[in-house]
């Protein structure tokens, strides 16, 4: 854990604008919930914690909210959240999923994770616009690993981050 935190701090010192813990490249699905909690409990000591983003990587709404609560109790309020995988979802289902999270934890800032190959769902521009309209302070950006949004999604004060190792 200490080496991971040190690595994150080092790349921040070199100019990185933020670090995601438990994203897909960080093998979130292979890290147990207890290991995630251990890591999260070690992050508040970093002087870069305001630039840390916690990827939830969980399909369960309850587990996602509980992990976010632990993060928030450690003064970590930015999250990368993918819609649950496995089942096929419509836009309204995805809006409902994020709405439940934000209703439970309104102090959170969320980056939507658009990665169809992992989740089975691809965000539409319409869905994102609805979420941002409904939650302008909480939905702050999208990581566009499916590359279907970055050219056409134009929302003020909203970040679009197109990148995936699949395309490198």
Regions found by a protein language model. Give the residues of each.
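N-terminal active-site wall of soluble small-molecule enzyme domains
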Residues: 38-44, 119, 123-130, 146-153
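Internal, well-ordered alpha-helical segments in soluble enzyme and binding-protein domains
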Residues: 97, 101, 124-127, 135-138, ...
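Short, well-structured alpha-helical segments in soluble
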Residues: 69, 129-133
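Catalytic beta/alpha-barrel core
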Residues: 80, 111, 137-146, 158-162
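Short, structured coil segments at secondary-structure junctions
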Residues: 75, 135, 155-157
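Short beta->alpha linker loops
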Residues: 59-62, 144-147, 164
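Conserved small/polar residues in nucleotide/adenosyl-binding loops
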Residues: 166-168
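Active-site beta->alpha loop and helix N-cap motifs at the rims of alpha/beta catalytic domains
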Residues: 1-120
């Amino acid at each position: 854990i200490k080496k991971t935190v040190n690595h994150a701090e080092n790349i921040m010192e070199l100019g990185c604008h933020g670090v995601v813990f438990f994203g897909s490249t960080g093998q979130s699905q292979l890290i147990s919930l207890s290991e995630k909690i251990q890591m999260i409990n070690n992050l508040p000591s970093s002087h870069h914690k305001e630039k840390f983003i916690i990827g939830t990587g969980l399909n369960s709404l309850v587990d996602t909210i509980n992990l976010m609560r632990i993060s928030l109790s450690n003064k970590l309020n930015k999250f990368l959240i993918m819609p649950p995988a496995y089942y096929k979802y419509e836009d309204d289902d995805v809006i409902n999923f994020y709405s439940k999270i934000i209703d439970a934890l309104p102090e959170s800032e969320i980056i939507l994770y658009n990665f169809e190959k992992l989740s089975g769902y691809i965000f539409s521009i319409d869905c994102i616009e609805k979420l941002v309209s409904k939650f302008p302070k909480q939905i702050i950006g999208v990581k566009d690993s499916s590359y279907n949004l970055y050219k056409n999604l134009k929302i003020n004060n909203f970040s679009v981050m197109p990148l995936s190792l699949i395309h490198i």
